[in-house]
């Protein structure tokens, strides 16, 4: 309530009422404005009348709010009224910032309000959300009279800690409130109490430049036994003295005051820096002079070191404070002092590009042969900087000591010329070469300066190095790894450097790994560099490394699609490496999608597809590997196998040609003898799709048409023949069961003998039919035995993994036993039991034959899944049957269905299916008083009803529904997998001549015409298809792709044009003798590197300096 009212009344804000407006409801906003007006007018009587008239419901909240404003405005009468009508807690209520009324009064310097609030019991030690107590606010705001009133209160804590542990004394020193500091010290405030950083009041006074406060603190400490020298050298948690903080502030008068009071210069803080090091870092020459002149110790303060063993001269050199450096040298600073990294001031200044200091030190005779921990001298670091040796005065370049450094090597064996070539400063390179430096000098890894220049793309430097050579030894020298400058330039994509080296006579050599320059360029995907190399030497595309890899292998493995396309267009040879992998295998195994798509779209796709080893275990046919690793690329390949005619899609003559060349290997491979241990299954691609669950590929129109072609060619006929042979046993067996009365035996004389004592004469009209059926059942069973034996010979171990084969053996065995009385006499009961088993499994196995048909096959699959779920839950069924069956046997054993344990369990199973038979088993025996234990019997019935019909059955239904949903989700995969399995098994059995006759490489389909196929095709459509035979894939919209391609070529043309203009402008600059920064910019980056660099940082064009130079020259030439 309070916060909403405060937000509502702010200067300059006028808010309109929003939302729903209620009529006949008093407006609190107007009441608040009126009450606030009373506060500012200072009328207690008016506020009292207002409260009586309005009858505010939240009087305490309103009074708390008003008390803050009344205290800030000094309205004592209102404060009396509010505090009289409220509890004591109103004095300690806080606003949004944690301020109490006392805070508000102190902040506004309302002395009377402070006295009134303290007299009413306000706590002066409460802190707001910024950890500021009223005393802190008074000291900080220079409200010393209010502070005096607060200090007179008996409960005031004069040493109370505020924000960051600062006491009122520290705050007084921060604000230079000397009057408040004196009063606080008189009231017992402790000047030795530090804050959370360990800073005492004297530290804060030194940092804030509060000279009066520092004098008061020092005098107070001196009066209490602390000498000024001891006090002025107190340290905080960072071991910093007041002098350190005074130097950080840069107040010369405060520093002088610290020194006059005995501040020591040599103490070091945690960073091992003295106060004078701080001054040297800031370049404060006057402060350094003051501190050096006032130092009277025995230590050489000018050359004292910090934690890094750096002197003041090192610090001045780091930030190019040349005036301070000149003064330090004049007072005896050691110009050759070494820090912890072995750097002298000269080396440190050179590394920091402090050229004023560098020239100063050289003029003072600094040693130039000192090396840092990396073995670099001053000249190594000089050539690394922009403009290099141009930053030094000309007379220094003539010094013999500097000339002797040009062949000096660092820890890696690199001379200054190596550094200059790596940095790309043509001016520095020219100066160094002017000292007769050998361009054949090698580093420890056998790299010459040309290696560095080529590696970093310094084309101007390369031109300068190759300008005066008389042989090509420098061009073709290899480093420690056998890499020539050509290798390094190609590896980093510097196409212009590669072109220069080739023009100068660089050879296409291989490094120690067998990699050529083309290998390195293809690994990085630098197509421009590759074009330069290929334009010079076309045969280098077929060079192999030690592992048998070509440049194609490298580009494909790294995923550089454009590089692969370039090599293929230049007729690069497609070979296998020592691991029997082609470049297509490497792209597939590394899942380089763009590379594979590029290969598919290339003119050499068929050639790439054929290159693989049949004996390689890890690098199989590219089609199967594509299905396994990159199915989306296989989908693109299948899209290319659909050729649409040029007619309109609505035209009757519109057709689609489906090409099946990628879905099955040649028939010869599937019929090979296992002499070479290379045998391919039929439908290799489709089987791979099934194994890897590639449902999106199996549902592709090309795959569907391929299966349809196989089905119409031989699948339907073969399956109908198989089904017909099975029906030769199924139908006669069914006729026998229907026409022969169970319990009667048929003998060879044609007499049916009843199992009872009397006999009947066989009806002669049916005897011949029964004999014929028995003979057919017998013959079909014998034929089934032969078929199963053949399958055992063909499938071997896999035959015993299929449970349907067990059903076949049971069917044929029980069928023969059932018709065996045709030849010999057998007991009638055995005959009819086998007949019951045979006819049961005959019809159950018939369902498995119907799996091949889509219309009913999916439901049979669902039945199998539900059956598996039931079998998994059999354990729960068994225990429940035993529990309730044995319990009912004890309670209901007088009834026939529960008279034995076995009968009781069977009856319980029947009850589980819903046949509870409550009336006969429970109600009537209870009414006749025949239940031995009625209460327990009914309790057990209720428990059985809850557990079995309700809980268990619902559980099974839920599992079945879940399984059905899962089956429906993968119905297409299962359906097509069955078709693939059928055709695979059939092709294994069919002869090669037949397959050649019926197999088709492609087929043409007219979507707008009815398919021809006669009765056979229509029967197939009725039994096999549930919906549309095919789903067309719409033609991809090529317009966007074509526009992007056009823009790509336009950008290439613009890039070429800009490069020409770039070269032209450089020539103009040279002719006009304009000097600009671009002359020292010897960098050549590939497009990829430039793009990455532009993404990381945005900077102005380097031609801005050229334009400025042109304008300056123009102004100079004007009269």
UniProtKB/Swiss-Prot annotation:
<dbReference type="GO" id="GO:0097237">
    <property type="term" value="P:cellular response to toxic substance"/>
</dbReference>
<keyword id="KW-0472">Membrane</keyword>
<dbReference type="GO" id="GO:0035774">
    <property type="term" value="P:positive regulation of insulin secretion involved in cellular response to glucose stimulus"/>
</dbReference>
<dbReference type="GO" id="GO:0070417">
    <property type="term" value="P:cellular response to cold"/>
</dbReference>
<feature type="repeat" description="ANK 11">
    <location>
        <begin position="412"/>
        <end position="441"/>
    </location>
</feature>
<dbReference type="GO" id="GO:0006811">
    <property type="term" value="P:monoatomic ion transport"/>
</dbReference>
<dbReference type="GO" id="GO:0030424">
    <property type="term" value="C:axon"/>
</dbReference>
<feature type="repeat" description="ANK 8">
    <location>
        <begin position="308"/>
        <end position="337"/>
    </location>
</feature>
<dbReference type="GO" id="GO:0016324">
    <property type="term" value="C:apical plasma membrane"/>
</dbReference>
<feature type="topological domain" description="Extracellular">
    <location>
        <begin position="893"/>
        <end position="901"/>
    </location>
</feature>
<feature type="site" description="Important for electrophile activation">
    <location>
        <position position="665"/>
    </location>
</feature>
<feature type="disulfide bond" description="Alternate">
    <location>
        <begin position="621"/>
        <end position="665"/>
    </location>
</feature>
<feature type="disulfide bond" description="Alternate">
    <location>
        <begin position="608"/>
        <end position="621"/>
    </location>
</feature>
<dbReference type="GO" id="GO:0050955">
    <property type="term" value="P:thermoception"/>
</dbReference>
<keyword id="KW-0407">Ion channel</keyword>
<keyword id="KW-0558">Oxidation</keyword>
<keyword id="KW-0379">Hydroxylation</keyword>
<feature type="disulfide bond" description="Alternate; transient; in hyperoxia; unknown whether inter- or intrachain">
    <location>
        <begin position="633"/>
        <end position="856"/>
    </location>
</feature>
<dbReference type="GO" id="GO:0071244">
    <property type="term" value="P:cellular response to carbon dioxide"/>
</dbReference>
<feature type="repeat" description="ANK 15">
    <location>
        <begin position="547"/>
        <end position="576"/>
    </location>
</feature>
<feature type="glycosylation site" description="N-linked (GlcNAc...) asparagine">
    <location>
        <position position="753"/>
    </location>
</feature>
<feature type="binding site" description="covalent">
    <location>
        <position position="710"/>
    </location>
    <ligand>
        <name>(E)-cinnamaldehyde</name>
    </ligand>
</feature>
<feature type="binding site" description="covalent">
    <location>
        <position position="665"/>
    </location>
    <ligand>
        <name>(E)-cinnamaldehyde</name>
    </ligand>
</feature>
<dbReference type="GO" id="GO:0009410">
    <property type="term" value="P:response to xenobiotic stimulus"/>
</dbReference>
<feature type="binding site" description="covalent">
    <location>
        <position position="414"/>
    </location>
    <ligand>
        <name>(E)-cinnamaldehyde</name>
    </ligand>
</feature>
<dbReference type="Pfam" id="PF00520">
    <property type="entry name" value="Ion_trans"/>
</dbReference>
<dbReference type="Pfam" id="PF12796">
    <property type="entry name" value="Ank_2"/>
</dbReference>
<feature type="site" description="Crucial for calcium permeation">
    <location>
        <position position="915"/>
    </location>
</feature>
<feature type="transmembrane region" description="Helical; Name=6">
    <location>
        <begin position="934"/>
        <end position="960"/>
    </location>
</feature>
<feature type="topological domain" description="Cytoplasmic">
    <location>
        <begin position="851"/>
        <end position="862"/>
    </location>
</feature>
<feature type="repeat" description="ANK 14">
    <location>
        <begin position="513"/>
        <end position="542"/>
    </location>
</feature>
<feature type="repeat" description="ANK 7">
    <location>
        <begin position="271"/>
        <end position="301"/>
    </location>
</feature>
<keyword id="KW-0677">Repeat</keyword>
<keyword id="KW-1015">Disulfide bond</keyword>
<dbReference type="InterPro" id="IPR002110">
    <property type="entry name" value="Ankyrin_rpt"/>
</dbReference>
<dbReference type="InterPro" id="IPR036770">
    <property type="entry name" value="Ankyrin_rpt-contain_sf"/>
</dbReference>
<dbReference type="InterPro" id="IPR052076">
    <property type="entry name" value="TRP_cation_channel"/>
</dbReference>
<feature type="glycosylation site" description="N-linked (GlcNAc...) asparagine">
    <location>
        <position position="747"/>
    </location>
</feature>
<keyword id="KW-0716">Sensory transduction</keyword>
<keyword id="KW-0109">Calcium transport</keyword>
<feature type="repeat" description="ANK 12">
    <location>
        <begin position="445"/>
        <end position="474"/>
    </location>
</feature>
<keyword id="KW-0813">Transport</keyword>
């Amino acid at each position: 309530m309070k916060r909403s009212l405060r937000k509502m009344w702010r200067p300059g804000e006028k808010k309109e009422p929003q939302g729903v407006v209620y009529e006949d409801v008093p407006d609190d906003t107007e009441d608040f404005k009126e009450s606030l007006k009373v506060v500012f007018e200072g009328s207690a009587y008016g506020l009292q009348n207002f409260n009586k008239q309005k009858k505010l419901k939240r009087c305490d909240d309103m009074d708390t709010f008003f008390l803050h404003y009344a205290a800030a405005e000094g309205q004592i009468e209102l404060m009396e009224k509010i505090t009289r009508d409220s509890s004591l807690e109103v004095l300690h209520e806080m606003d949004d910032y944690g301020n109490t009324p006392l805070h508000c009064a102190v902040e506004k310097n309302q002395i009377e309000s402070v006295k009134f609030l303290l007299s009413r019991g306000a706590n002066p030690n409460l802190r707001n959300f910024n950890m500021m107590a009223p005393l802190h606010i008074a000291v900080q705001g220079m409200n010393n009279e209010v502070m005096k009133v607060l200090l007179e209160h008996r409960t005031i804590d004069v040493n109370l800690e505020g924000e960051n542990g600062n006491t009122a004394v520290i705050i007084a020193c921060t604000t230079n409130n000397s009057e408040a500091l004196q009063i606080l010290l008189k009231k017992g405030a402790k000047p030795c109490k530090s804050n959370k950083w360990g800073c005492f009041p004297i530290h804060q006074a030194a940092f804030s430049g509060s000279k009066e406060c520092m004098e008061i603190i020092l005098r107070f400490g001196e009066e209490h036994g602390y000498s000024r020298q001891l006090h002025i050298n107190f340290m905080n948690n960072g071991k910093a003295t007041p002098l350190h903080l005074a130097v950080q502030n840069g107040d010369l008068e405060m520093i002088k005051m610290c020194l006059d009071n005995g501040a020591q210069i040599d103490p070091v803080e945690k960073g091992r820096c003295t106060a004078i090091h701080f001054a040297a870092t800031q370049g404060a020459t006057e402060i350094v002079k003051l501190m050096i002149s006032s130092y009277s110790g025995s230590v050489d303060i000018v050359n004292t070191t910090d934690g890094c063993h750096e002197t003041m001269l090192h610090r001045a050199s780091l930030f190019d404070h040349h005036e301070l450096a000149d003064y330090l040298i004049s007072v005896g600073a050691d110009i050759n002092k070494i820090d912890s990294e072995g750097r002298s001031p000269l080396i440190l200044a050179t590394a920091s590009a402090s050229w004023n200091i560098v020239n100063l030190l050289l003029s003072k005779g600094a040693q130039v042969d000192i090396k840092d921990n990396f073995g670099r001298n001053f000249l190594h670091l000089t050539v690394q900087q922009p403009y290099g040796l141009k930053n030094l005065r000309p007379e220094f370049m003539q010094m013999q000591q500097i000339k002797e450094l040009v062949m000096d090597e660092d820890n890696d064996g690199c001379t200054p010329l190596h550094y200059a070539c790596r940095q790309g400063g043509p001016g520095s390179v020219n100066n160094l070469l002017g000292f007769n430096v050998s361009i054949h000098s090698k580093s420890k890894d056998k790299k010459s300066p040309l290696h560095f220049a080529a590696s970093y793309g310094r084309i101007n430097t390369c031109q300068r190095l190759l300008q005066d050579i008389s042989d090509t030894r420098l061009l073709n020298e290899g480093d420690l790894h056998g890499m020539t400058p050509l290798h390094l330039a190609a590896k980093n994509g510097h196409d212009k450097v590669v072109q220069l080296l080739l023009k100068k006579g660089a050879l296409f050599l291989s490094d120690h790994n067998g990699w050529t320059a083309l290998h390195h360029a293809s690994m990085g995907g630098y197509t421009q560099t590759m074009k330069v190399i290929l334009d010079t030497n076309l045969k280098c595309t077929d060079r192999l490394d030690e592992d048998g890899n070509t440049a194609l292998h490298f580009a494909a493995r790294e995923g550089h699609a454009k590089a692969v396309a370039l090599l293929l267009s230049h007729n690069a040879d497609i070979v296998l490496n020592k691991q029997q992998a082609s470049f297509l295998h490497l792209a597939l195994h590394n899942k380089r999608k763009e590379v594979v798509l590029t290969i598919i779209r290339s003119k050499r796709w068929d050639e790439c597809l054929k290159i693989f080893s049949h004996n390689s275990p890890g690098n199989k046919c590219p089609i199967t590997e594509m299905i396994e690793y990159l199915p989306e690329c296989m989908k693109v390949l299948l899209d290319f196998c659909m050729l649409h005619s040029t007619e309109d899609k609505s035209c009757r003559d519109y057709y689609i040609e489906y090409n099946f060349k990628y879905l099955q290997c040649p028939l010869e491979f599937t019929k090979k003898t296992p002499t070479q241990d290379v045998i391919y299954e039929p439908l290799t691609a489709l089987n791979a799709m099934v194994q890897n669950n590639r449902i999106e590929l199996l549902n592709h129109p090309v795959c569907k048409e391929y299966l349809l072609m196989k089905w119409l060619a031989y699948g339907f006929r073969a399956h109908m023949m198989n089904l017909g042979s099975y029906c030769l046993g199924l139908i006669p067996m069914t006729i026998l069961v229907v026409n022969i009365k169970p319990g009667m035996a048929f003998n060879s004389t044609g007499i049916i003998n009843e199992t009872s004592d009397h006999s009947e004469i066989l009806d002669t009209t049916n005897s011949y039919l029964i004999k014929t059926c028995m003979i057919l059942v017998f013959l079909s069973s014998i034929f089934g035995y032969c078929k199963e034996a053949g399958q055992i010979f063909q499938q071997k171990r896999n035959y015993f993994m299929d449970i349907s084969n067990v059903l076949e053996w049971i069917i044929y065995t029980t069928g023969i036993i059932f018709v065996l009385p045709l030849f010999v006499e057998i007991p009638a009961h055995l005959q009819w039991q086998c007949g019951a088993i045979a006819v049961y499994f005959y019809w159950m196995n018939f369902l498995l034959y119907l799996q091949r048909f889509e219309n009913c096959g999916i439901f049979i699959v669902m039945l199998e899944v539900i059956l598996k779920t039931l079998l998994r839950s059999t354990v729960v069924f068994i225990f429940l049957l035993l529990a309730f069956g044995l319990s009912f046997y004890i309670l209901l054993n007088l009834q026939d269905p529960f008279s034995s344990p076995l009968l009781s369990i069977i009856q319980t199973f029947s009850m589980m299916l819903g046949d509870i038979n409550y009336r006969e088993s429970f109600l009537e025996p209870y009414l006749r008083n025949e239940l031995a234990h009625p209460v327990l019997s009914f309790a057990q019935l209720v428990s059985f009803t809850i557990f079995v019909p309700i809980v268990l059955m619902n559980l099974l239904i839920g599992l079945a529904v879940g399984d059905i949903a899962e089956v429906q989700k993968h119905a297409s995969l299962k359906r097509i997998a069955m078709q693939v399995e059928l055709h695979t098994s059939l092709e294994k059995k069919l002869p090669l001549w037949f397959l050649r006759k019926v197999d088709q490489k492609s087929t043409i389909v007219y979507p707008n015409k009815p398919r021809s196929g006669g009765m056979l095709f229509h029967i197939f459509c009725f039994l096999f298809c549930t919906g549309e035979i095919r789903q067309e894939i719409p033609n991809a919209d090529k317009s966007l792709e074509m526009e992007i391609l056009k823009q790509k070529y336009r950008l290439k043309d613009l890039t070429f044009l800009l490069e020409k203009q770039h070269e032209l402008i450089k020539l103009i600059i040279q002719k006009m003798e304009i000097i600009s920064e671009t002359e020292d910019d010897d960098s050549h980056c590939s497009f990829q590197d430039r793009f990455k660099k532009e993404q990381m940082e945005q900077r102005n064009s380097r031609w801005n300096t050229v334009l400025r130079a042109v304008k300056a020259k123009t102004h100079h030439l004007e009269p």
